Amino acid sequence: MIIFALIFGAIAIFTSFIYIEKVLPRLLCTFISGVILVGSIGGIVGNYYDHFGMHKVTETTIQKIYSADTTGKMNMILFQPIGTAGKENVYIFTRHENAKKVSHTKANEYTSNKITLTKGSEATLKTTKVRWQYKSNAYKFWFGIANNNNKLIKRTNRFYIPKNWFVLSTQQAKELKKKMSSSSFQAKAKEEAAAYVESKIKAAIVQDPSLMTDKNRQKKLTQQLAAEYQAKLLKETVSKIK
């Protein structure tokens, strides 16, 4: 609407100055038209540069997120450095359990990302967005043609990640996958896992002889120890590629 006021003011000031013969009415109409014209220009400039008629609105959302490993074998969040300086990262994760497609944060001048390690068991993403919004419908009516309502100023993504998760670059993840996929690594891991479980089972039987004849407990303990070794091996392998 402000554009129409600007056009009206320009036409009115021209018409008043040229076509109204009587001095007093001409001056009065020219003055009023000038106020409309200058006011419109001032409003447009103020809205464009200083967001006249607008205020900042903050919106915060919190959601549970899941591992970037869609196979479900590892709990991890990945990051990809962007820009030549490498000071900012795009983070990769999944938004739903058992999701086959990963999500990632935006890569633009409005977005910043932060990682906080927690003692909790769930990973969450807290997103805070700051936008420009019109203070009232009246301001929106006058300046809405600029299409700047709800314009994003800043987006902050804060990831709260459990300490037992891995935070890896995409390059590190590729190296890890390559290493763990090698036949020599898998053969060695299988051998070491068997030895680890066997030694722990023997130690448990020494402490509790009844375990020797309890096959169900042995099976459960074996599965627990195998998972324990897997986690230990994974942690050691990741530490070597960092």
Predicted regions and their residues:
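Membrane-embedded alpha-helical segments of integral membrane proteins
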Residues: 1-23, 42
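Juxtamembrane transmembrane-helix termini
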Residues: 18, 22-25, 49, 53
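Membrane-interfacial entry segments at the cytosolic side of transmembrane helices
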Residues: 25-33
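Transmembrane alpha-helices and immediately adjacent membrane-cytoplasm interface residues
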Residues: 33-53
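Alpha-helical transmembrane signal-anchor/signal-peptide segments
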Residues: 46-72
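Short extracytoplasmic
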Residues: 65-93
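Extracytosolic and intramembrane catalytic regions of membrane-associated proteins
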Residues: 94-242
